[in-house]
Amino acid sequence: MSSVKFLAFADLHHYPEVFYTFAPERLAAIRQRAIDEKVDFVISLGDFGGGKPLDLLAEYAAFPMKTYHVFGNHDTDNMTLTEAIKAFDMPGKGYYFFDCNGFRFIILDNNYVNIDGSILHFELGNYFPHPNTREILPAEQVDFLKETVGASPYPCILFSHSSIERECDQTPGRPFRSAIINRQEIIDVINQANSRSPGKVRMAINGHYHRDFLRILDQVVFLDLNSASMEWVNNPHDHFDRELTAKHTYAANTVIYNEPLCAVITLDHDGTLQIDGMKGSFYKNVTREMTDNPPCDRSGRPCTANIQSVKMKMFYR
């Protein structure tokens, strides 16, 4: 029985002057787990770093197995797209696919914003003033997805930074930050492919929200992958030492995970899916509930220092 096994992590946020994530130590632990589990490849689901994390990018590229990136919104905060593609050694324009052990893995880049009618990639913070028109998959990529899935001889897995599964928050005056704005176009591509060939698109994995959640829609498994490092809170708290918050600009706007959260995912062609997650804990025992912030995000998902483990078998017909 043919299978593929990979390690996925998201939102490492290596930006030492801004966040206290001790990212080098986390990445080293992720590397060791990937070696111990004998995975076929490792993939970062975005927000690897917010500055110019060239040192850590080199360490990641030197893993003893294939490594891949998905662009996150913060990966181009201090770089142009051209600079980021070079720094991350990203194929093509930042979206691409690869095949491994009889599966096709498709990497999407939803980091686009509509500014005065122009669809532009996030870079150098250009999207910050436009919360209502950000997170878009351009038409070019929708076509790429349709063609890449349609031409695939293998079952497909999708990776993106933002969620395909979460519904957009269309409350007047509130930003569309819950999901990719044109997510329905992506869902339509998935459903059309699966109606022609059941099980053609089997799974979609995203980062970005720092949440642990799994949902099955129309026989597709959607995994909202937790951050490897921490959770952002809009209202700062005073539970960390002043020395720490003085050294790291936005440490007080985070609750931090002690463990480098990541998941080892195994897929078999017979429809078996296994996610081996992690149980973690909070740095200094400071949880989101202890801060002056809502306990859940807009989708009602709580902040935990875990990635769930699950084993299931999907039947496609």
Language-model features: locations:
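N-terminal active-site segment of His-dependent metallophosphoesterases
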Residues: 1-55
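Active-site neighborhood of phospho(di)ester-bond hydrolases with catalytic His/Asp-centered motifs
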Residues: 7-10, 42-47, 67-73, 157-160, ...
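Short active-site segment of divalent metal-dependent hydrolases/proteases
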Residues: 14, 49-50, 75-76, 164, ...
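Short, flexible/disordered intra-domain loops and linkers
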Residues: 17-24, 168-181, 234-240
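Extended active-site neighborhood of metal-dependent phosphoesterases/phosphodiesterases
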Residues: 53-151, 182-201, 215-226, 230, ...
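Short, well-ordered beta-to-alpha junction loops that form the rim of enzyme active sites
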Residues: 110, 159-165, 207-209, 278-280
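Short acidic, glycine-rich surface-loop motifs adjacent to enzyme active sites
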Residues: 147-169
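Binuclear metal-dependent phosphoesterase catalytic core
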Residues: 189, 211-317
